Amino acid sequence: MTLGIGNDIIEIERIQANIKKYGQRFLNRVFTKNEQIYCLNRKMPALHLAGRFAAKEAVVKALGTGFSQGISWLDVEILNDANGKPYVSISPLLTQLFASPKLLISISHCHHYATAFAVWSS
């Protein structure tokens, strides 16, 4: 059963501008080390970072919390399986708050935008 859905879209340039302005401080605040390693080793890092940014936003929208109740950007981690499919890994805080939620995500991007959709199901 579907318990919540969320989506988000972001301009890739917005992520690029934050990296340029704030550098590692921005990256460490929003992205886990694993996310940074994956994205920064891609041909177009900002595109992949923007996809993860949108996915994190979509996940907290699906859960209905946004980034509140002590939930931070680092509580939601977007990883890829062996086939490249993105999946969500959540912190112990989110696992406790939502009794190990099942979360599915889809990420898409083009030249200017990244978008993500998340489904929380039982």
Curated annotation (Swiss-Prot):
A Gene Ontology molecular function term for this protein is: holo-[acyl-carrier-protein] synthase activity
Arranged from A to Z, the UniProt key words for this protein are: Cytoplasm, Fatty acid biosynthesis, Fatty acid metabolism, Lipid biosynthesis, Lipid metabolism, Magnesium, Metal-binding, Transferase
What's this chain's function?
A: Transfers the 4'-phosphopantetheine moiety from coenzyme A to a Ser of acyl-carrier-protein.
**InterPro entries annotated for this entry?**
4-PPantetheinyl_Trfase_dom, 4-PPantetheinyl_Trfase_dom_sf, ACPS, Ppantetheine-prot_Trfase_dom
Please give an example of a GO cellular component term from this record: cytoplasm
- Leader sequence range is none
Q: Which GO terms describe its biological process?
A: fatty acid biosynthetic process
Binding residues for Mg(2+): 8, 57
Which protein family is it in?
Answer: Belongs to the P-Pant transferase superfamily. AcpS family.
- Write the gene name: acpS
| Catalytic reaction(s) noted | apo-[ACP] + CoA = holo-[ACP] + adenosine 3',5'-bisphosphate + H(+)
Q: So which cofactors does this thing need?
A: Mg(2+)
Q: Where in the cell is it found?
A: Cytoplasm
Give the top-level enzyme category: transferase
E.C. number(s) listed in UniProt? 2.7.8.7
One Pfam entry for this protein is: ACPS
Q: Under which name does UniProt file this protein?
A: Holo-[acyl-carrier-protein] synthase
